[in-house]
A protein has these predicted regions:
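Conserved ABC transporter NBD signature motif
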Residues: 57-68, 72-73
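Conserved ABC ATPase "signature" region
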Residues: 97, 101, 106-121
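Conserved ABC ATPase signature
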Residues: 125-129
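Catalytic Walker B motif of ABC-type/P-loop ATPase nucleotide-binding domains
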Residues: 150-153
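A short, surface-exposed alpha-helical micro-motif characterized by mixed small hydrophobic
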Residues: 191-193
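ABC ATPase "signature
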Residues: 209-210
Length: 238
């Protein structure tokens, strides 16, 4: 397994933000971590990354502890957050060079720039980029270490339909080569395009874990979106 999470919990004071969640992924798999705002998605990812304090039965990445073997593990794990902050006077190329300096081995940066449609923009200041370009850059940087596992938080927020589909195509090609992905998203078409399985959280607890077809079948709904709304407890808002 690339990632194994067994009975992980996060507590803030007396409140359990995450309550005994478990999941695992193998090379070439994508799991979608879904839930309404406040369901615990961010807390879960932060705990798995070792940023948030947590209790767990097992937590391993690439067969090692992301907490005890942190430096070694994160040479092969990429992370993209929804809000990536860049220095105001940094160019795209300088941002890539900064990220490259953190790793012993890196991917082919010119190829990544081409893949993500940023060729010819290398000398542009990051602050001058459009929202979609900044999002593509943040995903590129998460992949610069040529990782075996990457965490993508709200992957295509702010992107138009064409840019979203372009990014899906690129990630599917990387998935075929063995890249494992943990993805959070509010877009069910994105989840259907990318994910092998999903885990839906409600108030920090797992309310569904399985494949998309299993979610649709078990909920007795016609679509993934309807199944998601059912499990996440958002049907009452419609």
């Amino acid at each position: 397994m690339i990632l194994t999470v067994q009975n992980l919990s996060v507590t803030y004071g007396t409140k359990k933000a995450i309550d005994n969640i478990s999941f695992s992924i193998e090379p070439g798999e994508v799991i979608g971590l879904l839930g309404a705002n406040g369901a615990g998605k961010s807390s879960a990812i932060m705990a798995v990354l070792g940023i948030e304090k947590s209790n767990y039965e097992e937590l391993t990445m690439l067969g090692k502890s992301p907490i005890l073997d942190r430096k070694e593990v994160f040479q092969e794990v990429g992370v993209q957050f929804q809000e990536t902050n860049f220095q105001d006077k940094l160019t795209i190329l300088e941002a890539c060079e900064q990220w490259e300096s953190l790793y012993k081995q890196t991917a082919d940066v010119p190829l990544l720039l081409q893949t993500f449609g940023l060729v010819g923009k290398e000398t542009q200041l990051v602050k001058s980029l459009s929202g979609g370009e900044r999002q593509r850059l943040s995903v590129l940087l998460a992949l610069i270490s040529n990782p075996k596992l990457v965490f993508l938080d709200e992957l295509t927020t702010g992107l138009d339909t064409k840019a979203r589909r372009m990014l899906w195509k690129q990630l599917l090609a990387m998935k075929e080569k063995g890249l494992a992905i943990v993805l959070t998203s509010h877009y069910m078409d994105e989840v259907e395009a990318l994910c092998n399985k999903i885990l839906i959280l409600k108030e920090g607890k797992t309310v569904f874990h399985g494949t998309i077809q299993e979610a649709i079948h078990a909920s007795e709904k016609a679509t993934l979106e309807d199944a998601y709304l059912h499990y996440a407890g958002e049907e009452d808002w419609i």
